[in-house]
């Protein structure tokens, strides 16, 4: 490797050639971020691992990982969807109109959180937004099951909300391809790929070949703070409206501190 270590910059290349593995490389997408010391932002290339691209790469190049972390078997998929038969979100869901959907639809969940990365425990602590996804039928530890989408320092987000809006718009672009089960003919900015580009040649072909697997966003794994900041949930810190978006309790009609059965 690397001429017995003399050329260390070539070691990764040589290792990949010897193992015949396909490297999973992050893409970049342009987002407006805050520029320190100015009231405006600048556009920067942010590294991102598109869920649909990673989904397809694992299926096509890492079948062992696919069977362990994403989809153990079509029978497991069918068993999962049978267990969701009474779930309200399943009623009139567009995937149920697809042929053999119970054996092709892979349920996924997105996890998001703000993670302290510098000055932990200090008043000047800086955090990072980390988003990842996982299959809901796979097996493994948290480290093995969760696949990174993006990580960004919270200080980069513009106060206007533009950064987050565009970030989620780009992620939705990827999730739509995951749900369609096909590569899009358009990039995340809405521009059509050229017919002679690799992206253009694979446009509207299946992510997972003849098996036709596709991903369905079926779960959100976040704490209440993240649900409020990212998805606009009812603010649990406003006690006049109640502490939880799923519960009708408040201060007056259904007092959240009154535990008598007559009040429930």
Labelled PLM ranges:
Residues 103, 121, 155-166, 231-239:
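Conserved aromatic-histidine-acidic binding/catalytic patches
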Residues 111, 130-134, 151, 218, ...:
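Residues in well-ordered beta-strands of folded domains
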Residues 114-120:
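Short acidic, Gly/Ser-rich segments with clustered Asp/Glu that frequently serve as metal-coordination loops
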Residues 120-121, 256:
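Intrinsically disordered, low-complexity regions enriched in proline, serine, glycine
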């Amino acid at each position: 490797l690397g001429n017995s270590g003399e050329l260390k910059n070539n070691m990764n290349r040589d290792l990949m050639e010897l193992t015949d593995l396909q490297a999973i490389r992050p893409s970049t997408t342009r987002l407006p971020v805050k520029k320190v010391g100015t009231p405006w932002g600048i556009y920067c290339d942010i590294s991102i691992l598109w869920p649909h691209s990673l989904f397809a790469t694992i299926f096509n190049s890492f079948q062992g990982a696919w069977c362990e972390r994403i989809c153990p078997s079509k029978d497991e998929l069918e068993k999962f969807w049978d267990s969701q038969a009474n779930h309200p979100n399943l009623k009139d869901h567009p995937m149920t109109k697809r042929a053999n959907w119970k054996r092709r639809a892979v349920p996924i969940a997105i996890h998001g959180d703000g993670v302290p990365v510098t000055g932990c425990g200090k008043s000047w602590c800086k955090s990072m937004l980390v988003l990842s996804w996982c299959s809901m039928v796979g097996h493994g530890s948290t480290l093995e099951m969760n696949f990174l989408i993006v990580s960004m320092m919270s200080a980069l987000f513009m106060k206007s909300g533009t950064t987050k809006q565009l970030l989620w718009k780009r992620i939705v672009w990827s999730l739509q391809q995951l749900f369609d089960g096909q590569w899009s003919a358009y990039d995340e900015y809405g521009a059509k790929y050229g017919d002679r580009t690799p992206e253009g040649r694979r446009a509207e072909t299946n992510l997972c070949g003849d098996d036709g697997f596709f991903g369905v966003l079926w779960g959100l794994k976040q704490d209440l703070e993240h649900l409020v900041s990212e998805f606009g949930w009812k603010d649990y810190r406003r006690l006049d409206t109640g502490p939880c978006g799923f519960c009708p309790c408040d201060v007056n009609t259904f007092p959240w501190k009154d535990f008598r059965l007559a009040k429930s």
